[in-house]
Amino acid sequence: MARCCKCPRLHLAVTVLACVLVFTEGVNLNDLLDRASQLSDKMHSLSTSLTNDLDSHFSSVGGKLMRPSMCHTSSLQIPNDKDQALSVPEGELLSLVRSLLMAWSDPLALLSSEATSLPHPERNSINTKTRELQDHTNSLGAGLERLGRKMGSSPESLSSLPFNSNDLGQDNISRLVNFHFLLSCFRRDSHKIDSFLKVLRCDAAKMLPEMC
């Protein structure tokens, strides 16, 4: 663990969490799921905070265009609620979580690059939070990979969800609308990821379904 203390101090909170996840090969399943749930909770909270920042200036336009069926992850067949998630085998549910998270690697990179020059009065805050969100997602992805090995989840079971856009538009309105829409899709998916990880944590702890 000593090497992690020498990590750069940029995004300190994220770095500490990442270091914790790196050295987890000998940690039991319950602890791994606890740590993954903590990361997913922070990730969802941060995406909610980012959405609120955008809405402070742009809710009237951005809100009208949010159609979940237009999100690039909408084709992934996932449980609609907790009861459905509880009926899915653990390995399959973890594969769904990993597939959903992996699908956001390129979109989050695009959001991070666009945030630096986004025409919004809260640009500095949005830029900082977007980079933190990307760091959280990368850390969670590393943790889920270790969870997959622990639970015997095969990489072949992961679904590929391509993202085919490399910009958010040329004019300011288009950039704001598309940034808002993409972030809204991520917020929706981050809630699912967080919920499914909590279901997995409940299963591992042998908790009663009504307590999950």
Curated annotation (Swiss-Prot):
Give this protein's Gene Ontology molecular function annotations: hormone activity
Looking at the UniProt record for this protein, which Gene Ontology cellular component terms does it annotate, in alphabetical order? extracellular space
Keywords linked to the UniProt accession: Disulfide bond, Hormone, Secreted, Signal
Which region is the signal sequence? 1-26
PROSITE patterns under this entry?
SOMATOTROPIN_1 (PS00266), SOMATOTROPIN_2 (PS00338)
Q: Where in the cell is it found?
A: Secreted
Q: Name one GO biological process term.
A: positive regulation of receptor signaling pathway via JAK-STAT
List S-S links within the chain.
C71-C185, C202-C212
Origin, by domain of life? Eukaryota
* Expression (tissue specificity): Pituitary gland.
UniProt record similarity statement: Belongs to the somatotropin/prolactin family.
Protein's name in the database: Prolactin
Q: What is the lineage of its organism?
A: Eukaryota, Metazoa, Chordata, Craniata, Vertebrata
Question: In the UniProt record, what gene is named as encoding this protein?
Answer: prl
